[in-house]
Each structure stands twice: as structure tokens, then as C-alpha cells.
Amino acid sequence: MIRHVAMFTWTESVTRDEIRSFAAKLTTMPDVIDLIRRYEHGEDLELGAATADYVLVADFDTVEDYWSYSGHPYHVEFLETHAQHIIASVARVQYHLAP
């Protein structure tokens, strides 16, 4: 099992409507891309010094499934229309989950 974690920092000009649209589109991802085994995302709670504004956690059975998700047309369209213009930076990590 592979876990993908992406932490996003917004641009200074991002609006609440853009964040809501981003989150709503993310919520639909597992319905369209059936390779996703677990999918969670949410805004930082600002409980301490934050390094990111939003996080996504997704699990996949294999590395190949992760790459298929990454290149899936729905995911690519999401990045182009709902993400790239509001994200100042993103940190990603993928790792194997212990059996």
C-alpha cells in the first residue's frame, strides 16, 4: 500500500470561494478514480505554527496505481482548473505503509 501526502500553501490572493471549490472538487476524486483506496483532505486548524494551509492524504494499492492517479485526466484537469492558480507551494511525499 502506498500513501500520498500533499501539503498546500495558498497564494496571498486566494479567496474562500476558491478554497471551497478546490475542496469540493477534491471530494469527487475517489468517485471518478477508482484506484483510490482512502482519501482525506482538509484545512489546517491553525493550532500552532503552520507550514501549510491544506492537506491531502490518499492511499493506493501499488506505485503503479499512484502513477495512474497522478496522470488521470480528471486529476490533471483538477490541477489545471482548480489548483495551480491558488497554490503558492506544495510539498509531497509518497511512502509504503507498513503491512
Regions flagged by a language model, labelled:
Residues 31-36, 59-93:
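An amphipathic, aromatic/His-enriched active-site/gating alpha helix that lines ligand/cofactor pockets
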Residues 4, 26, 43, 54, ...:
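Aromatic-enriched hydrophobic runs in primary sequence
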Residues 1-41:
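N-terminal first-folded block
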Residues 11-13, 63, 98:
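Generic structural motif
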Residues 3-9, 41-70:
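Short, well-ordered beta-strand segments in beta-rich or mixed alpha/beta enzyme
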Residues 18-21, 48, 71-74:
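Generic, well-ordered alpha-helical segments
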Residues 40-50, 80-99:
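Glycine-rich beta-strand-turn "strand-cap" elements at beta-sheet edges
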